Amino acid sequence: MKLSIFSHCALDTIHLEGNSYEQIGGAASYCGIMAREFKFDVNLFTKFGSDFPKQYLTEHKINLINSESDKNTTKFSISISGADRTLKLENECDPIDYSSLDADGHIVSPIFHEISNDVLKKIKDNSNF
């Protein structure tokens, strides 16, 4: 089965107990990798900059559709203190463009402003639900 995912990849800096950790984040990364684990063919509609380690996606054989941007990747800083969490946007990448591809399903999971109403309408119009 073919799955199209529309979401930004992100870079997250997590601050916890005086230490900082950097990792990939965003629904695009997690949904894409998990869908491949379930043997879906994945087309990922996303945007990221040259600062994003895209090998995490390509080594899972995720098809990247018009994904590279001249801007840096969307980035969040996440501070964790006990049960409290603070999330700060540090950078916002380009919005995602729509491209039509044959898919059995679509996941639209924006993390911050990357899906315009026009793009969402085109996704819905191209879906069979």
Where on the chain are the PLM-derived regions?
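Histidine-anchored nucleotide/phosphate-binding helix
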Residues: 26-37
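Short hydrophobic/aromatic-rich motifs at helix boundaries and adjacent loops
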Residues: 2-5, 25-27
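Active-site glycine-centered loops adjacent to acidic/histidine catalytic or metal-binding residues
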Residues: 8
